[in-house]
Amino acid sequence: GGKPRDVELKALFRIQGPKEANSGIQFRSKVRSDGFVEGYQADIAKETRFFGVLYDETPKRGLLAARGQRVVIDEAGARKTEQFADENELWKKIDLDGWNEYHVTARGFQVAAKINGHVMWEVTDREKDRHGDAAGVIALQLHVGPPMQVQFKDIRLKVLTEAK
């Protein structure tokens, strides 16, 4: 249980199935009364557009950062995006048929992720009434769709505390 705010999460994962297969690791998220989990999602997919991106399952947010992007979201929700690495080169660092490691860090308004040691995205999210620095649940997603298999192992969570 619990709803950590500042965390470092590492997990090995693999996804098998058709190109529509989709999953993710949700963090700083909330569970709605209908069971749907909304919030940040470090995305996992068989299709290039979504694998290794930061998606927000909250209505009206969607894709926050593609692979290789550094995004700053201000209090009004305006986004400033910088491409720090080629998304196709980062795509080549992912093993589509084997195990990969996600390493997600959330501290204050900043969230970032690596896959297999390569930085995929960095986001500073200060949008008002969102979850940029909120505490929330961690969840593993199996997306609706055709038959697929998603496996996770060696999940490690470290709750980060501020230095006193």
Residue ranges and their predicted role:
Residues 1-164:
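Carbohydrate-interacting regions of secretory-pathway proteins
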